[in-house]
Amino acid sequence: VKNALIGLATAFAIALPAFAPSALAQTPAAEPPREWIDKDTGHRVVRLSDEPGSSSLYFNFNGYTPQGDKLVISTPKGLSTVDLATRKLAPLVEENGKFLFVGRKTRSAYFIVTEGETRVVKAVDIDSKKVRIVATFDRGDIQTINADETLLGGVVVSDPKIETRPDGVLKRDNRYDQAAYAANGPDGKPLPFAEAKEVRLNERLDSKIPMEMFVIDLRTGQKRVVHAATDWLNHLQFSPTDPNLLMFCHEGPWHKVDRLWLLRTDEANAKPVKIHTRTMNMEIAGHEWFSADGKTVWYDLQTPRGEDFWVAGYEIATGKRTWYHVERNAWSVHFNSSPDGKLFAGDGGDAEMVAHAPDGKWLYLMHPRGIPDVAGIHAPDSEHLIRPGVIDAERLVNMSGHDYRLEPNVNFTPDGKWLVFRSNMHGGQQVYAVELAKPASAQ
């Protein structure tokens, strides 16, 4: 069993960039440009970070202050803030650990460190830079904080004797902020990265390791289990607006699992609610996120895998669904939505990835367009059917120099005027932003 156990911590770290270790694997390179106009798109791109090894958060984690004035990023030395008005970079805290998220209520950035046998969650005040301990626990990892910053959510393997990150089975590759998913195919030859990842995910899923999802009450320090299963539980996300609504996924090959689930943490014995049910073999859904208003869960849907692409939405209160069709080149490793809910963004992908896009290495701004009924004639059951639409994709940044083993993880700034992303296009990993409006000279 041990050789089949893929480390849970490696999956968590996709979302949670480490402070210092990521710098170790960075390749020295010439100083990347601070600002330029993309010659293929006409959009302005700026570099927000100073040092290789800097990183913004995973696409569905919040890195912005509640007031929307600052972004927090990880650097080789710790955490820094970016003033979004001036782009001034300032150190926030220097401490080895893992950046978790920024609170939605207070101006606090949370990170986690290991002290002996204890996991310690700390918060640093973005203005005073004072650090405080907010929670301690023995095992597992923290993945989310709720809307009013009263609950942390995390996962843990139930049996402490199970080794979940054995050396030699799955080593981390800090250049790409995820595990080194190397594997051979049936012919003994190395598989492409995307296929090797599926093999390793499947091995971990088939191990059926008992797991628990837990919350820690930051007012009392109490830790309680909210769900237990032998499914591979991962990617916990609290709603940005409902403090007691938790989304999580069943990790593994997407065509093999029912990935998307919601769970209420304020109801005793609450059962998880499945968000999406497949209707065809090889249909996949994942890389889910909440809309900014917390009313909709959006996700990448493919019917079937690698052939037909959608940004799909599930309205939590009503169960109504919306599917926006995406053409192959615009399929993205991760999609995201703007603060006002009117636009989407995507970070593209290379030819080895699931879409096998011949020209997909771009960052995109995506304009959703609903498909109306013909001549205003409504089907009698139209209210109960999926609302269809299409995505009109606009290219923002040429990513031809980017290695997509590092996921760009696009996210909108709070004012909706920029997309922040990370990239190794100039060698070492840096944090960048692209302006959605073109400069007057480029229009």
PLM segments and residue spans:
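Loop/turn-rich, solvent-exposed surfaces of beta-rich toroidal or solenoidal domains
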Residues: 295-310, 325-391
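Asp-box/WD-like beta-propeller blade repeats and closely related beta-sheet repeat scaffolds
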Residues: 96-98, 112-212, 225-228
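Blade/loop signatures of beta-propeller domains
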Residues: 26-46, 202-214, 380-387
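Blade-terminus and WD-like Trp-Asp/Gly-His loop motifs, strongest in beta-propeller folds
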Residues: 61-70, 99-108, 143-156, 237-245, ...
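Structural motif
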Residues: 78-80, 117-123, 161-167, 208-214, ...
